[in-house]
Structure formats: structure tokens, C-alpha cells
């Protein structure tokens, strides 16, 4: 999920992705190759194993790590995410509560989409079962969820049509591939 979202948003925003070494190296060398229902192309964006100092003032941080890694990710980037907008785009329940211990600006997100690894820095999107959903945790939608507009601006297609997206309350389910990401407008 993380590298795919970073790739799609790199066309409309400045993006840095924090990824495992093999993926970060591959993205730096040849970009991320994406195929499937969201289109085909090679995407180039900033990617490394850690968050460079220049990226610590991002508009949004998107966490797509496995639920079991949420607290470790939050601890690793605690100084960067404190007081910042943090989007939880992860499998599992309870991620928003964990993130909420590190920032009071948590956005829950849900995406029911199948992302398939086709090699290092190569992803195939084969299924989209529902629109992406975003919502302020724990209260639902508010005007600060401008990330919804940023996500809508990313050129994500579903069978040749723009993907749909809704902003609503707390997320109970979503899908991820164990990477940490963030988006900057």
C-alpha cells in the first residue's frame, strides 16, 4: 500500500517514502513500476530507509506498517509526528488509539484493494472492492481532513474511471504491506 500510495501521490505532491532497504534502493535506482487497474507506469519519488531532516515538517504522515509495528513506527518518528496530521492506512483495529498517544491529530483511513508484489519496487493493483474512506479519529469528519482533497487529486484510476473516495468516521478495516509513508502537499 505504502509505496503505491507514494507513487500515485508523487504526481500531485512532494512525497518521501520510508521503506525497507531493498525497496528504497530499487525505487531510487529505477522508480516504482506499477501495473493493474490503477494504470501502468514508472513513478520516481524520494525514498530511503529513514526520514531525512528536511521531511520532518510534512503536512501529512501516512503510516502503512503492519499493526504489530505501529507503536515502533510511532516511537521511531515521535519527534516528527508530534502535533502533526498522521493518517493510519493499516490492517487491524486499534491503530488510531496507538497513534493517538503520539499526536492528537489522527486520521483513520480504509482501503480495500489488492496490492501484489511483482518484485522489488514493482506492484500490481488487481482489485478495488470499495472507495477509500478517511475520517478524523475519534470524532468523524472535520475541515482539517484536507488530506481527502490531496488523495482525490492523485491520478488513481479504476478500470479507466477515477477512483472514488469518501471522508467519514472511524476506520474499522483496511489493508497494508508493512511500509511507513507520509505525504506532503
Where do the PLM segments sit?
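Interdomain hinge/lid region at the active-site interface
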Residues: 185
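Active-site-adjacent beta-strand anchor residues
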Residues: 17-20, 63-64, 88-89, 137
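NAD(P)+-binding Rossmann beta1-loop-alpha1 motif at the extreme N-terminus of oxidoreductases
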Residues: 1-36
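Rossmann-fold dinucleotide-binding core
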Residues: 56, 90-171, 182
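Rossmann-like NAD(P)(H) cofactor-binding subdomain of soluble oxidoreductases
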Residues: 39-123
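Oxyanion-binding "anion nests"
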Residues: 175-177
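Class I S-adenosyl-L-methionine
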Residues: 10, 28, 78, 100, ...
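Flavin (primarily FAD) cofactor-binding/catalytic cores of flavoenzymes
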Residues: 19, 33, 77, 143, ...
Amino acid at each position: 500500500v505504502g509505496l503505491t500510495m507514494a507513487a500515485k501521490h508523487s504526481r500531485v505532491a512532494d512525497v518521501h517514502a520510508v521503506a525497507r532497504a531493498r525497496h528504497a534502493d530499487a525505487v531510487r535506482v529505477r522508480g516504482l513500476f506499477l501495473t493493474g487497474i490503477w494504470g501502468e507506469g514508472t513513478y520516481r519519488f524520494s525514498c530511503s530507509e529513514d526520514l531525512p531532516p528536511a521531511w520532518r515538517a510534512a503536512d501529512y504522515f501516512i503510516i502503512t506498517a503492519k499493526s504489530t509495528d505501529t507503536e515502533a513506527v510511532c516511537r521511531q518518528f515521535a519527534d516528527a509526528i508530534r502535533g502533526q496530521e498522521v493518517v493510519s492506512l493499516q490492517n487491524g483495529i486499534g491503530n488510531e488509539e496507538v497513534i493517538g498517544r503520539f499526536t492528537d491529530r489522527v486520521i483513520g483511513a480504509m482501503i480495500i484493494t489488492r496490492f501484489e508484489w511483482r518484485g522489488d519496487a514493482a506492484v500490481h493493483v488487481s482489485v478495488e472492492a470499495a472507495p477509500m474512506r478517511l475520517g478524523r479519529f475519534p470524532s468523524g469528519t472535520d475541515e482539517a481532513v484536507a488530506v481527502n482533497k490531496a488523495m482525490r487529486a492523485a491520478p488513481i484510476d479504476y478500470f479507466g474511471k477515477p477512483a472514488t473516495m469518501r471522508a467519514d468516521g472511524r476506520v474499522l478495516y483496511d489493508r497494508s504491506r508493512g511500509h511507513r509513508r507520509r505525504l506532503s502537499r
